[in-house]
Every structure is written in structure tokens, then in C-alpha cells.
């Protein structure tokens, strides 16, 4: 076990005094790291996530290299879907491809439930390796949100307009709600197992929910999100972060959820979120494209985010989306160091 652990991110969420604004980066573990790219010459994503020693190594790298205040488990949001009967393949340059998309209620009924100890022991073993050995910051576990998982399962892969997903919602509510309920059950078990293995925070990625308007979110998604988060919190008092992209119109709906942290993409500033009435700890939200700019531009864009965060008093610095593969590791190291220095109390 680690002594003198850096719990800055947990203190920030609890409203306790911190020495600086905590920082971590979505997709910090993986594609921007030379060590990871070398591994990918030999192993696929699923190969790495199925080998706890390799997965723990990749998860730990950014903490060592960038001095982040949290680690996020290296895995894919598709991980819990394979065991329940989803034939998923990660294709380079495309993303997840589903070979047996959901079309009918019978397709939903064919899905099995997840038993994390039996079906994803490698995920739990990775967490145990990290938390029982030398990780000196909290570990973030995660899951995809029901809508985002369902959209992949219905569309058969990434989509620009989610026509098949919306068509199912509007045309076949029975199938839609059956799928939502099944995915909530899977997610609760999956997330709970991660916490029991040692994860100290959970992030829910609802990457594509911005495709819905407020009315549809309230009818088709919100009750299921409330159930998912509430059932996890009934079992363990773990902080929950929610993040989505292009969904500023849903901010007030998210603020109603029993989450602890609301992640902002780069389109909505911290001040704007406050003006909209958000009361949660805020996470974000540098445009990841800025990391490809010269350092003077990066610093110029960092300062207002950090100033607004310090004024708000409850802020975790992050990007407004994941790290691009083209970002230089030294840039991430400099950003992390700048956040720590600039916000030092």
C-alpha cells in the first residue's frame, strides 16, 4: 500500500482544501505515449486489456510521465459488451464495429447478464495490481453510458446522425426500454465490481448523447441514468463523473443527476456552466486541439480556464475531449506542471 498518497482530486470533489487544482487527461493512458505505441506494434487493444500486467503498465505511465493527480484505467467502453453476447471488433481508423446489431426485442432477450468476476477478471485483476502496489493517486474506473453503448449496438458502429437509434426510440419503445434496462443492469454490476476491486472514482462516458434534444433525453435516457448512478451509490459512496460531447443543452438535466462531477467539453466555459445553474464540481475543459499549438498559445488558453476554476472553487482540470495521438508527451507534461504551479495555494 502507498503512504502519503496524493488524494487532491478526492479532496476537491469533497470540497476540502487542496494545495492545487487537480489535473488528469481523458485518454492520457495510451495513444500519445511512445511506450504505448511500441506495445501496439505487438499487441492489439484487447490483447493489452486482457493482460493485467500490461494494462497496469499502460494505466500507470501517465502518472509517472505527466504527474497527473489521477490514473484512469486503460480499457475500452466496449469491454463489458463482449461477455453479454455482443460481437464487437475494434477496427483501426473506424472504432468499434458490431457484427450482430440490435434490431428487435428478441435480440435484446438474447443478451446475457454480466458476472464481472467470471467475465472480466482481467479488468479487476488490473485494478487490484494498481491499487495494491505503488499507484500513488486515485484510480478512475469507467463505463460507457447506456445511450452511448446502445447507439453502437443498434447502429453497428460509429454514426453521424444515429438514425437507427432514434428510430428505435420513437417506433419501438418496448425494445428501447428493454435495452436500456439491460444495459443499466450490466453497468451497475460492472462499475460496482471496479469499485470493489479498488477504483476510487467512476467516470461515465456519454459521448454521443448530444444527438438528443432535451425532451427526448428526459423521456428516453434520464430515468435510466438516475437508476444507474443511484444503484451504484447505494452500494458504495463513490464519486461519479459524467462526461459528454456537444451536449451543453443538456447541462441542467445532468445537474439534476446524482453525480458529483460534471465534465464540460471545450464549447462551454466554466463561467457559462455556473450561469446555467450548475452546482456540481466542474471538470475540463481545454480544447484538445490547442495542445498542437505553440506553448505560448497553450498557456494563453490555460489561464482563463484555471482562473475560472479557482473562482468557482470546485474544479478538476482536464481537456474537453480525449488526447489526440499527435500530441507530444512533453506538452502534456508541461500542461500538468503549469496547472500545478499556476493554481498553487
UniProtKB/Swiss-Prot annotation:
Q: Name the gene.
A: hemE
| Gene3D superfamilies, sorted | 3.20.20.210
Query: Record's SUPFAM superfamilies?
Result: UROD/MetE-like (SSF51726)
Q: Where is this site: Transition state stabilizer?
A: 76
User: Which family is this sequence assigned to?
Assistant: Belongs to the uroporphyrinogen decarboxylase family.
Keyword tags: Cytoplasm, Decarboxylase, Lyase, Porphyrin biosynthesis
GO-annotated molecular function: uroporphyrinogen decarboxylase activity
- CDD domains per the record? URO-D (cd00717)
Q: What is this protein called?
A: Uroporphyrinogen decarboxylase
Q: Which residues bind substrate?
A: 27-31, 46, 76, 152, 207, 321
The residues forming the signal peptide are: none
State if Cytoplasm is listed as a keyword: yes
The record's Gene Ontology biological-process terms are: protoporphyrinogen IX biosynthetic process
Main subcellular location? cytoplasm
